[in-house]
Amino acid sequence: MIQKHLTIQNKLGLHTRAAAKLVDTAKKFQSKIELTHRDRTVDAKGIMGLITLGAQKDNVIDVMVSGEDEAEAFLAVEKLVNDKFHEKE
């Protein structure tokens, strides 16, 4: 299992479009990917759960990945978050 803190860096936080990109990324992998914010944990492969986290810019989220391709899955999620979900602002 890989567990690490990541900081949401994009201006609008984990809004619908960013959540959809995260779901698309998570679904490429077999591993279980979960995000935790403020004592609430959700499956990264479900958009509604991600949106309900309410993670805003500069909020810290915990990412937990477990499974056969956990290293690749974590790196993909980390890159997406660090690249501000490919948003311009």
Where are these regions (language model features)?
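Intrinsic-disorder/low-complexity, polar/charged segments enriched in Ser/Thr/Lys/Arg/Asp/Glu/Gln
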Residues: M1-H5, V60
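C-terminal structural segments of small proteins and small subunits
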Residues: Q56-E89
